[in-house]
Amino acid sequence: MPRPAYRSRSLRRVKVRTPGGRTVVHYEKRAKGVPKCPVTNLPLGGMNHKVYRFGISIRAPSRPYGGVFSHKVLARALRLAVRG
């Protein structure tokens, strides 16, 4: 039985063949997904999702709520705010 830390499915399991011919299980972190809008569930435009070592202020567009909401949701919210 694996260690208690490896029993959960938060780490993905990869079968690796060793030089001695045995097959062992390695545990790796799962790949991160593309950033998505919480309202429309569309991928966020303008986000550099491949560069995770930089902060969100460098990766995200500089518009209001950039990197949080999609452009469609932002346009709708701005229209509602202006109209009253």
Swiss-Prot record:
The highest taxon in the source lineage is Archaea
The cellular component terms of Gene Ontology attached to this UniProt record, alphabetical and capped at eight, are: ribonucleoprotein complex; ribosome
Give the molecular function GO annotations: structural constituent of ribosome
GO biological process: any one? Answer: translation
Keyword check for Ribosomal protein: yes
User: Has UniProt tagged this entry with the keyword Ribosomal protein?
Assistant: yes
Which UniProt key words apply to this protein?
A: Ribonucleoprotein, Ribosomal protein
Family affiliation:
Belongs to the eukaryotic ribosomal protein eL34 family.
- Which NCBIfam families would you find in this protein's record? PRK04059.1 (NF003143)
Q: What is this protein called?
A: Large ribosomal subunit protein eL34
Source organism (scientific name): Pyrobaculum islandicum (strain DSM 4184 / JCM 9189 / GEO3)
Its taxonomic placement starts with: Archaea, Thermoproteota, Thermoprotei, Thermoproteales, Thermoproteaceae
